[in-house]
């Protein structure tokens, strides 16, 4: 009996140690890999969030930029990390779009990662050169449907959210269009300002500043209500357009197999941080809408986005590379 008791204690000790470790989580800094270069919207969002999250966790949140391959390099590093909650990623749209666009990835975004929380979204904005006769998106669609020549438009680049979203619009409302691809939104916006391309679809920041300055006209904000940043730009629903309020979304993921206690702690502290009025004010000023979702809701969102945009890519034969 003594021998049996000793054996049972030996078996239970590792489990007890693991439970105590999870109860003490976190007991050291958390590394948040942001898979883009410093300075962009994804990086700015997570660097703004990090100190507020750290305050709730009681440990520093160290942001580490690891760009490359459409965010795949940084995401893969997290997918292959130890599932202890100390290595996470702050990701953008490519968490779903890389798969939807058929890119070969060293990880599966559903099977190899754990969704922690959706953090923010950033509404899409449809703008046009002042010389365009249409004063809203409904008028632009009606004009495009009445002509045989394709409507030229641009976005943040081939395979960007604005690109795929407008392809969905064109498919639903059945008009010809031609996507003019640029390497990023800066050259695209420059040519819209110059009148070389009439229409641009991209996130509200930085494009919204040009609407405020009167250099382009805002045709629609892809949001359930008008944006505080651009209160004069109408929503889709106000224009009678039956389209989803899809938007670029940012969230936190970890490797597959995160212990439930660790996942709950990460989500709980992250949600509490995002409820801070000071942080919400900063993010709102940057053009973000705070979400602060559960792990289940964020995981479901990733799967839904993959399914939605995979169909758009297939139906419209979109190639991003």
Model-derived features: positions:
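Short beta-strand->loop
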Residues: 108-118, 176-180, 198-199, 208-246, ...
């Amino acid at each position: 009996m003594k021998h049996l008791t000793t054996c049972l204690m030996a078996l239970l000790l590792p489990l007890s140690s693991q439970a105590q470790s999870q109860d003490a989580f976190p007991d050291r800094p958390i590394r948040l890999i942001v898979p883009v270069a410093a300075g962009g919207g994804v990086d700015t969002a997570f660097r703004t969030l990090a100190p507020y999250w750290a305050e709730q966790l009681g440990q520093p949140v160290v942001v580490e930029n690891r760009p490359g391959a459409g965010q795949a390099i940084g995401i893969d590093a997290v997918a292959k990390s130890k599932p202890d909650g100390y290595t996470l990623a702050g990701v953008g749209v490519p968490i779903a779009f890389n798969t939807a666009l058929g890119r070969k990835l060293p990880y599966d975004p559903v099977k190899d990662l754990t969704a922690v929380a959706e953090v923010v979204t950033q509404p899409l904005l449809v703008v046009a050169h002042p010389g365009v006769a249409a004063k809203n998106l409904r008028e632009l669609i009606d004009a495009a449907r009445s002509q045989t020549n394709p409507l030229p438009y641009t976005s943040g680049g081939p395979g960007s959210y604005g690109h795929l979203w407008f392809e969905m619009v064109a498919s639903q409302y059945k008009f010809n269009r031609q996507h003019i691809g640029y390497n990023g939104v800066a050259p695209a916006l420059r040519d819209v300002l110059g009148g070389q391309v009439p229409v641009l679809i991209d996130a509200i920041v930085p494009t919204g500043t040009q609407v405020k300055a009167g250099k382009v006209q805002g045709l629609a904000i892809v949001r359930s209500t008008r944006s505080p940043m651009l209160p004069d730009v109408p929503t889709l629903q106000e224009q009678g357009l039956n389209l989803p309020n899809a938007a670029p979304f940012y969230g936190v993921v970890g490797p597959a197999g995160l212990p439930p206690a660790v996942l709950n702690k990460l989500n709980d502290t992250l949600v509490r941080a995002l409820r801070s009025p000071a942080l919400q004010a900063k993010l709102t000023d940057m053009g973000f809408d705070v979400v602060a979702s559960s792990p289940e809701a964020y995981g479901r969102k990733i799967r839904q986005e993959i399914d939605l945009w995979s169909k758009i890519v297939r139906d419209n034969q979109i190639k991003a590379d």
